[in-house]
């Protein structure tokens, strides 16, 4: 999976929270037969089964601290969506935008609403079936009692917006609106950094005012800041 998230910080906590966060699924050579995708474009959404490739779980930990609970309360790992799991597998529901068949790398599936790091291994793809997979009356457990409110994103200098294309700008604004900071680490005067696509975004946050202010945007090329 190729996404704009080159590091863990900033990745949405769940799939679908940021529809503008896009990704491309590129297959290994042995799976590039277009016949394997025949009929997939009849569906609007897909289930993606993938691996937390950057997590190193050396021993089984039965209790974890969900972000929804502010990093203070513990829940059983199987009662949460913690990335630190015994089998290291993730499950995401994404929107199917289109399929490109004429690529030199074989078929490429373009999706949106991703919550995965760039380079994440994909183990399987299945169509999302609303009649079977949607449960409107389902209980959200502790997640329903501890809502994760979005914050208002502002720009310190309007000229910073011109440093990125509109699609990237909108994606960045919506990613930051989810407040990527850890619940236990929300220092008001700290300057945070987030990498998305080829851009390094710096911002400060005010939890009391419910705002995140973008203070700088620097384009990076091959890991180096581009000189303006």
Model-derived features: where do they sit?
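Glycine-rich, pocket-lining loop/helix-strand segments that form or immediately flank
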Residues: 50-78
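Short, conserved beta-turn/loop elements at beta-strand boundaries and strand-helix junctions
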Residues: 6, 98-109, 208
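Short coil-to-beta-strand transition motifs
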Residues: 84-94, 197
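Basic/aromatic recognition patch in beta-strand/loop cores that engages polyanionic ligands
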Residues: 186-207
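Arg/Lys-rich, positively charged N-terminal/basic patches that mediate binding to nucleic acids
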Residues: 1-34, 40-42, 130-174, 183, ...
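Flexible glycine-rich active-site/ligand-binding loops centered on an Asp-His dyad
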Residues: 109-143
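Enriched for short, Lys/Arg-rich terminal
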Residues: 206-228
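Residue-level recognition of beta-strand microenvironments
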Residues: 4, 99-102, 114, 125, ...
